[in-house]
Amino acid sequence: MSLFYKEEHLTCYNYKLSASANFAVTNFKKNDAPQVINIDRSVLFFILSGKVSVTCNQYKNREHQQGEVALIPRNHCCYVRIIEDTTVVSCSFLLNIDFCNHFSFRNLSNFIPDNFVYDFTILPIRKRVSEFLNLLAHCLEDGIECMHFHELMEKELFIFFRAYYSKEELASFFYPLLGKDLDFKDFVMSNYLLIKDLSEFASQANMSLPTFKRHFRETFGQPAH
């Protein structure tokens, strides 16, 4: 569907500004080369159609198909192999959002299931969320790219998360973004190419070397070296 006064939209100052959340629709073909994705924001990947295989850090070759949403935390590198023709709606966001005025990300820590071990949790795209995503995709394809549009859609999306998923589901899904380890992860991922020596890394993190090594193993599941 075409926009009225398209030139006014395209020349608007707000089309040039970066929003706190950015949505995009991407189409992949089966024969497309594997995609390597480095991100400095957390990203939600909603598969509207098709199937892909995702490798992200220690999580290898996880199939992700139509009707599912995956979370890639910021400062992670992912390798995506296209298995079938695939359409993705992605939402990259900063961690300064809430589900609603009465429920924030911080609240999710209280709903992590007992003995939970994170294993790249995938959630189903519920019916109302699917309807929202399809309308959103059409609007983006029509050319609505205003900063305010993206920010309003972000708020609506997280209200849908609040409404159509249990708190336990959300805690399991957003687990990588919860707790004190996120700042440590960000620090390591932002500096590992700049700092080569573990002692200097520990010093920059204001930790003793044994504490840094222990924290690294707890956070990344492997020893620092």
Stretches with model-predicted labels:
Residues 105-133:
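Aromatic/histidine-rich interaction motifs
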Residues 125-138, 150-154, 171-205:
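A short, Lys/Arg-enriched amphipathic alpha-helix from helix-turn-helix/homeodomain DNA-binding modules
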Residues 63, 147-151:
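Alpha-helix N-cap/helix-initiation sites
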Residues 17-113:
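N-terminal regulatory/effector-sensing and dimerization cores
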Residues 160-167, 195-225:
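Basic/polar phosphate-binding segments, predominantly the helix-turn-helix DNA-binding elements
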Residues 48, 162, 189, 193:
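Short, locally clustered residues in the helix-turn-helix/winged-helix DNA-binding domain
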Residues 1-19, 139-142:
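A short, N-terminal "cap"/entry segment at the start of jelly-roll beta-barrel domains
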